Amino acid sequence: MRLQILLIYLICIIVSSIVLVESSNKHHFKENDEVPFYVNNVGPYSNPTETYEFYTLPFCKPSSISYKKTKLGEILQGDSAVLSDYQFPFKSSFENKQLCEYTLKKEDIEKFKKAIGEYYYAEMIYDDLPIFSFVGTVDDSDLTNIRYYLYNHIPFEFDYNGDQVIRVNIDTEHIKVIELSDQDEITLKLTYSAKWQPTEHEFSKRMDLYEEFFTKELEIHWLSVMNSFFLVVLLTAFLAIMIMKILKNDYSRYSKTDEEEDSDYQEDYGWKLVHGDVFRFPPYKNVFSAFYGIGWQFISIVCGILALSLFGMFYPNNGGNMYTAGIVLYALTSGISGYQSAKMYKNMGGNKWAWNIVLTATLFVAPLFIVVILSNTVAITWHSTVALPILTMIEVITIWLFVGFPLTVVGGIAGRRLSENFEAPCRTKNFPREVPPIQWYRRLPCQILIAGFLPFSAIYIELFYIFNSVWGHSTYTLYGILCLVFLILINVTVCITVALTYFQLSMEDHKWWWNSFINGGSTVVFIYMYSIYYYYYISHMYGLLQATFYFTYMLIVCFFFFILLGTVGFYSSLIFVKRIYRNLKSD
């Protein structure tokens, strides 16, 4: 375990160097220096995934289209920034500068009306700072005469400190509009202005300004998290005391039974009765081992992502650093999955080593690949910028083929050779004991409801903020809270899974291996149900493109956390079961 923690630490250092934020030395300017101004994407405000290139709308284009050089993470998040004709020399203020003047045809007017009616939202970039603005506004107070207004003058405000840009904003109070009437042609004149003003904010903290904007409900947020934290502490204490008290009584009863004379001998009962079967390995050893190994890899990835977030790697408009970090972490931690999977597989007496490695390497990647192909096909049909270019897909596949898969093989070989034999406190009998009939409310489906609901209830408030960030326009920057919530989730999962495993053994049901894994991961059932509720009743998302991305990628996210939490549930149950049977004197 210490080796794994050290490995995660080293990997985080490597990832930090790969996705490191550009040095502030590249953001120094002299007065009147030209700073490139990029226009990125446009799309419906309600559908954050449905984005299109800026010039799919009939704005006046530059004489030649020059795309901004993009990193892997920027491509994955659908960025398609183009150098525009806007010119903002450093520290140079001006009024009503003309961008262009041209004629809108009938079809161009209809395109703008459609975009304004769907609340199209545009993103622009200046010195790596994001600028957001609607395309126009609509007056629908009279439904019989809806009027559309296009922004034709945008006033920009710039804050600077010395020779560096600190913030860029749009003065919404002084935006000018032009009505898009039903004429066949409209002459459109686009203008803009710039106002530069000094500030005391430091460049190194310029992203804090965006964090302040996006965290107005910080106090409510912290209050809800602390409420969940204290509830979890009480739940953990209650379950721990209850289990310890029950186990103490069990040990006392079993000790009395062992001390009785042969004439008064009583047959074992409860969880002691299944001591000869409790360490009998489950069916589908290869699949179970693969899940287990991948689960440890995912735990490492989440810990790495959280560590990088606390180091300030993921700030607003960070060029897709989180996507890049996720891919690099997945590739570099593949050895962990191979090692843990092979180690468990050897303990179970498996001998199909090649199949074990292949299954470990593809059990998550294969469903992910199917989802990417499906969603990418829809995005290409819609001509959206979220459609991944073929070269990008080849690049990601190459990373997996030449880094991820080989590390899985190396980890598998190491796990096979370095792992020790499985040490069970009790000897397993030759023939499995028949499981007695169990009441319906004690069976696995009911266990799933209990095991999934309690961890979900501890995190559902945080899910709202996470969903607003991932599937909305909010920016999540409270990574300290996220770490705390993750620890709460792990803690509740451990407590509930261990308790359910004990009750299952008490009913003389020794088939706890798969049950503990499924119970641990059952929280994702409620997470996916919440995602359905969020889509239809909280968000305003619509359309096939957005729905395809939303529901398919939520399936993958839930599958990810099913494996992660399932591994946590099983591993904690394994430690618990070993402990109680080690303390029991068995015949």
Curated annotation (Swiss-Prot):
Native organism: Dictyostelium discoideum (Social amoeba)
UniProt keyword Iron, yes or no: no
Family: Belongs to the nonaspanin (TM9SF) (TC 9.A.2) family.
Factors inducing expression: Isoform Short is induced by SrfA.
InterPro entries, A to Z: EMP70
Keyword entries, A-Z: Membrane, Receptor, Signal, Transmembrane, Transmembrane helix
Biological process, per Gene Ontology: asexual reproduction; cell-substrate adhesion; phagocytosis; protein localization to membrane; secretion of lysosomal enzymes; sorocarp development
Bilayer disposition of the protein: Multi-pass membrane protein
Primary location recorded for the protein, binned into one broad class: membrane
Pfam families named among the record's database cross-references: EMP70
Name of the featured protein: Putative phagocytic receptor 1b
